[in-house]
């Protein structure tokens, strides 16, 4: 493992933090992980991200980098020698950024409505959720990974949300696998040891969701 002055402020259930753990693992970067309590944010978090006051934050040589896709690009640029995530071709790179942004703009907010919603709103959220993943299946096509033959930027941006699939399905009583078989095959291709070890067990995420629903009065 390469030794660097790298700190990751994170929360174990955060899909946005998981993608950074994956990237650092793939590139063999040694780092210090600091778990944040989102109900009682640390002085370090507030100092390092005074604008948004949220995780994840990568601190490299004392300097903070915020927003997960921005951090993901930073990691790829600084440690570009091993396991490059973004393509070298400018057009392909622009497409990878487009789909990563699509993932960020769509999945988290719709997924939250899936696990927290009720009645018609939840049913509508489920339909939107499946449509999002069918759109992603269309982009994946017959490729092994979104970028082709090698695991890349879009894969790392998306795969953390699979650890939430059990929670989505259990809370809303539906099957993602039944609706999106191609995505499940892709998910199985992501059983890279460095990827899987960077993701929490789905039941741990479900326990977190139940706790969150209780706090929000949704249980």
Swiss-Prot record:
GO MF term set? glutathione transferase activity
Give yes or no: UniProt keyword Secreted: no
Using the record's annotation, list all stretches that form the GST C-terminal domain: 89-208
Q: At which positions is glutathione bound?
A: 14, 41, 55, 67-68
Q: For this chain's UniProt record, which GO biological process terms are given?
A: auxin-activated signaling pathway; glutathione metabolic process
Enzyme class (EC, first level): transferase
Please name the InterPro entries in this protein's record: Glutathione-S-Trfase_C-like (IPR010987), Glutathione-S-Trfase_C_sf (IPR036282), Glutathione_S-Trfase_N (IPR004045), GST_C (IPR004046), GST_C_Tau (IPR045074), Omega/Tau-like (IPR045073), Thioredoxin-like_sf (IPR036249)
Record-linked SUPFAM superfamilies: GST C-terminal domain-like, Thioredoxin-like
Q: Which reaction does it catalyse?
A: RX + glutathione = an S-substituted glutathione + a halide anion + H(+)
Q: Could you tell me what induces this protein?
A: By auxin and cytokinin.
Q: What is this enzyme's EC? A: 2.5.1.18
GST N-terminal domain residues: 4-83
Which keywords belong to this entry? Auxin signaling pathway, Transferase
- What cellular component terms from Gene Ontology apply here? cytoplasm
Q: Which PANTHER family match?
A: GLUTATHIONE S-TRANSFERASE PARA-RELATED (PTHR11260:SF756), GLUTATHIONE S-TRANSFERASE, GST, SUPERFAMILY, GST DOMAIN CONTAINING (PTHR11260)
**Protein family membership:** Belongs to the GST superfamily. HSP26 family.
Give the function comment from the record. May play an important role in hormonal and growth regulatory responses.
Give the protein's recorded name: Probable glutathione S-transferase MSR-1
């Amino acid at each position: 493992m390469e030794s660097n002055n790298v700190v990751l402020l994170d929360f174990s259930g955060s899909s946005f933090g998981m993608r950074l753990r994956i990237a650092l693992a793939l590139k063999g970067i040694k780092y210090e992980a600091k778990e944040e309590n989102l109900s009682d944010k640390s002085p370090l978090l507030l100092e390092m991200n005074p604008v948004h006051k949220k995780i994840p934050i990568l601190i490299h040589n004392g300097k903070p980098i915020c927003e997960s896709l921005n951090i993901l690009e930073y990691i790829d640029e600084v440690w570009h020698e091993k396991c490059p995530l973004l393509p070298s071709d400018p057009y392909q790179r622009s497409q990878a950024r487009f789909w990563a942004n699509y993932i960020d703009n769509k999945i988290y907010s719709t997924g939250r409505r899936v696990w927290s919603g009720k009645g018609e709103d939840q049913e509508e959220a489920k339909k939107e959720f499946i449509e999002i993943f069918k759109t992603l299946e269309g982009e994946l096509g017959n490729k092994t990974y979104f970028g082709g033959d090698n695991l890349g930027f879009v894969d790392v941006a998306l795969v953390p949300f699979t650890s939430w699939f059990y929670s989505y399905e259990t809370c809303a009583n539906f099957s993602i696998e039944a609706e999106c078989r191609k995505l499940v095959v892709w998910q199985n291709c992501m059983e890279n040891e460095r990827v899987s070890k960077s993701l929490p067990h789905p039941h741990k995420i479900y326990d977190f969701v139940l706790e969150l629903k209780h706090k929000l009065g949704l249980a």
